[in-house]
A protein has these predicted regions:
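C-terminal structured domains
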Residues: 42, 46-181
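Feature for intrinsically disordered/low-complexity regulatory segments and propeptides
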Residues: 1-72
């Protein structure tokens, strides 16, 4: 039955710490070629028991153009109106999204940070579900009531789970992590 969602090989399932059994509920949606933001956020919410998961599409990013592909007179990539680009990079909105997980208590917030218990599982699941290896950021938002003032000796990681001005942070206590460029 795992073959329906592309997980027929037991070695593939064993190689990652994702609870693949929860994926069976999405077998029909996973059989298709593309994944809508609603499907991706729904799967992530279901697999991690999260209530507030969303995706922002069409996020602006800058893509560097390798030197050998940059436009040069008398070289390839210099046909006006076809493949000419000026500069060493381009602005792109088709290859990046933001995965937002909101309303997390302090512990769940910590679980999704790079050194947290669920970070690697989440990254593997997103890679599997999206299929196309798009660039994305992970934005984690802590519940405002869980934002604590910075205090030495406490569970404090400046820039991750503590804020110099917690009053301002309570308005939008979010951390954005660049997962894939």
């Amino acid at each position: 039955i795992f073959s329906l969602v592309g997980l027929g090989d037991p070695q593939v399932r064993a190689a990652t710490p994702v609870n693949w059994s929860k994926m069976l509920a999405y077998a029909g949606m996973m059989a298709g070629r593309s994944r809508s933001p609603e499907v991706v956020s729904g799967i992530i919410g279901h697999c991690f028991d999260l209530d507030d998961v969303g995706i922002e599409q069409w996020v602006l990013r800058r893509v560097e153009i390798p030197k050998d592909q940059q436009t040069r007179l008398g070289q390839a990539n210099a046909a006006l109106g076809e493949d000419t680009l000026v500069g060493s990079g381009i602005r792109d909105r088709s290859g990046k999204f933001i995965l937002r997980i909101r309303n997390l208590d302090r512990q769940r917030f910590a679980d999704f940070l790079p050194n947290g218990d669920d970070h690697d599982r989440l990254v593997k699941l997103v890679e599997f579900v999206t299929r196309e290896q798009l660039a994305y950021d992970l934005e984690l938002q802590m519940r405002p009531r869980d934002v604590k003032p910075m205090q030495l000796g406490a569970d404090v990681r400046l820039g991750w789970n503590s804020f110099v001005t917690p009053e301002k942070a309570r308005k939008l206590p979010a951390v954005r992590l660049q997962i894939r460029r």
